[in-house]
Amino acid sequence: ISVDLLDPAEATAKLAGLEDATHVFFAAFQPGAGAAADYAKNIAANRDLLVNSVSAIDKASARLERVVLVTGTKYYGSHLGPYKTPAREDDPRHAGANYYFDQIDWLTAFQRGKPWDWVELRPQTLCGFAPGTAMSILPAIAVYAAISKELGLPLRFPGKPGAYNAIYQVTE
């Protein structure tokens, strides 16, 4: 379904046919202009993506059982610099703006009294593909693999030994 999740009316109309939906996996992201310099610019749009999506599907489907919110290590402040590792789900929120906090707070409040539940996943890296975004390492690895093959080279890890031997979590 092609839908502008920032438009609540369009989201409601186009997702209305999901009356048999039982699970929602939400991993949408809208980078804001200048967001790297001012992370607070991401908050409203990314909260609204979740609000419009979940509100529409909650309205459409009486069979909804669970919403899975995919966040990430920015919850712990990874975008601000080094953070305590291993990170734990019960770690306190970092100081400063973070759209994950707004999403979690909204989803917690919206879900109260509803017959469905929700969970949050926090992978270190989320790989995937969406047109117009450079948020995935997969296309770069694919190009590296294609060039290696074309040159008759074996596919080797393109980083340092420390990165190769590190424990890391990736979700697709």
Regions found by a protein language model. Give the residues of each.
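Short-chain dehydrogenase/reductase
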Residues: 43-47, 85-86, 92-105, 134-138, ...
